[in-house]
């Protein structure tokens, strides 16, 4: 190259070009790519005035405007990427506050859209104002109860007839399309309305479309002339029916969350009841249990009415000694029947409090726990149980392995953020085994904690409800604990839950027997059905292969009709769930959670249906470490098998598209789209199975709290605590940090009006951000530290609000990236014999993805460059 350029170019230009070539090579570009990059640069200098200030601003903002193109390491087709990204920036990603004259039409449309949103936001208030007289005058109040029931019956009957017509009326493709457009238009109109009315309307529209789909599936899509197609079609229809039932029950369960607030306690503390706090443990490390006991000692409650018990099913002497040192009671059984339930029932023989509060040994209660919960028991004499959320300050395997901690709602957020709140509306709150208060008298009436199943908590609440007692749920987190440390431990925990809920379904079926209200029966059944999702999920992951591999028509209908029925059913359900669940579960993430668990919960739930007494209780390990990143090949084996099976389907589908009957081409395309979606979800499951490092023994908790540090010479600095753990803190000093690494300082924290001092050592200094390591603490200092940090009343309350709102399209893009990430991990960790194949496939996909335009990474200086780009 140097000889050619020396002959063609003058020396200064040649020297600069050679320097650019060497720079490209230094950054990893191949010789061909570097040569081509120099050629493109010459063409750019010839045809584009790069010295112009506008182009200079664009070049300065290259990293923001073209985030996927590395200017220091060119690739052969970078000009195509530049062209696509530039068109995207000009057409699709422009965000100018002041529209240009040539876009007045678009500006007018935006004004109309703004007025429409304003009108929709004001609509609920106007409707409330217009209908206020109905509440004031009680226009039906003069009618007898029988007449009001008659009117209600007529309205319900008319509504059911209308719904039946909408569901069963057959349409040709055009009429079906028009009908769907009307419903879709209605959904788009109401989805932005605030309040619960929009959610109710979306539920009605979604149920209309979904019920119509199920009716169509049962009446028009089974091929009775082909045994293979009939069997495969019935299997898929079984899975779809299950999904439809869960959808309907789920809407019912969360249609009107109660959002219960605390009831204040009497000012006279003599009226406050006595409470026993149980902390059961079996094989956990003492360090895991200590924080729970220390926090319990600081609960705001009269000390003469509070008894704390360590229930040690391991019979360990160090636990007995620890209990004696801190002044709590200790019980150890000689026998260990019925695991945790038996441990608690044994303690009930000795405890005499009016209420019992149970915490898993890693769940650290806040100081306000009892004051926030017990007030309801004094107000409602039939209230037997009050449950609060299980909040986790460490990432679960999904969050840690995917790097999504506090960025996406975790798996349990939906249940504790919305489902339990919805259950509370129907008086069907479940006891979850920890972070709860139970009235002792009803608990004694049912014989203590249920021992017949491995999910003793849910079974206990079912028995309380059968006795006519009520339950309650408060969504405000009042305790926090450790999430499972590995995917295998997480799956083991879910297997136990799944087996236990199916055991309850068989042994104490909520649909039968006395004592339950209809709504309670539905809520319990939906909880049990949730854990039966394994087999239906596996069916969905393999269903399109029936047509591609076996030529079985699982949905015996034209591809156009399949699209007109299937897509609206899925889109309406996704839109409705996004509206209802958006703060607690982002769109499409349920697919990942269910896929990871499906293979493992399917066998135990099936066994429990057949033999409910089979199975044993297993304790979930907490507080472990993951020393190195690795793929859990044992856990991921089923996912890889399903990936390979679907890849075979892709290969056969491609062959059938080019060489099969022309009449089946559209059906092949539909099946291939389904297969590719399944591959994305399975890739996400593989990504979860890559265990990330977890080398901290003490998890850091992010929070903002005022504090101060004092040097040995007495000089004080005000600071803000940014995070803390059981072993240290991260602080930000307000001002200049005149502190050195290794220096010993005292940390001053406040709890209420009391100030506490803790000895620390400076572990790191980065500007005004300082890392502190706690020096060895006395028992009392450790108690004080836990109560100043983990047990603060406001520590966990705002975590839920930190999650971003759900945006379905962005969430779908996240799942696409996640799926691709899983296959990249397979390429990285696969055995050498197959690593080459995975690398070729992932490199091919990466190459295709590199052409997709990206939204610019906005910065403070990006605006002028964006404007300059639009003017070229």
Curated annotation (Swiss-Prot):
Give the EC number(s) under which this enzyme is classified: 2.4.1.12
Question: What InterPro entries does the record point to?
Answer: Cell_synth_A (IPR003919), Glyco_trans_2-like (IPR001173), Glycosyltr_2/OpgH_subfam (IPR050321), Nucleotide-diphossugar_trans (IPR029044), PilZ_domain (IPR009875)
How the protein sits in the membrane?
Multi-pass membrane protein
Key word Iron present in the record? no
Keywords from UniProt, A to Z, are: c-di-GMP, Cell inner membrane, Cell membrane, Cellulose biosynthesis, Glycosyltransferase, Membrane, Transferase, Transmembrane, Transmembrane helix
Swiss-Prot/TrEMBL GO biological process terms: cellulose biosynthetic process; UDP-alpha-D-glucose metabolic process
A Pfam family matched by this chain, by name? PilZ
This protein's record includes keyword Transmembrane helix: yes
Q: In which pathway does it act?
A: Glycan metabolism; bacterial cellulose biosynthesis
The region called Catalytic subdomain A is annotated at 271-364
Which cofactors does this gene product need?
Mg(2+)
List, from the UniProt record, the residues annotated as the active site of this protein.
313, 457
Q: Which reaction does it catalyse?
A: [(1->4)-beta-D-glucosyl](n) + UDP-alpha-D-glucose = [(1->4)-beta-D-glucosyl](n+1) + UDP + H(+)
Domain of life where this protein originates: Bacteria
Q: What does this protein do?
A: Catalytic subunit of cellulose synthase. It polymerizes uridine 5'-diphosphate glucose to cellulose, which is produced as an extracellular component for mechanical and chemical protection at the onset of the stationary phase, when the cells exhibit multicellular behavior (rdar morphotype). Coexpression of cellulose and thin aggregative fimbriae leads to a hydrophobic network with tightly packed cells embedded in a highly inert matrix.
PANTHER family on file: CELLULOSE SYNTHASE CATALYTIC SUBUNIT A [UDP-FORMING]
This protein's domain notes: There are two conserved domains in the globular part of the protein: the N-terminal domain (domain A) contains the conserved DXD motif and is possibly involved in catalysis and substrate binding. The C-terminal domain (domain B) contains the QXXRW motif and is present only in processive glycosyl transferases. It could be involved in the processivity function of the enzyme, possibly required for holding the growing glycan chain in the active site.
| NCBIfam families attached to this UniProt entry | CelA (TIGR03030), PRK11498.1 (NF008558)
Report the sequence similarity comment from the record.
Answer: Belongs to the glycosyltransferase 2 family.
The name this protein goes by in its record: Cellulose synthase catalytic subunit [UDP-forming]
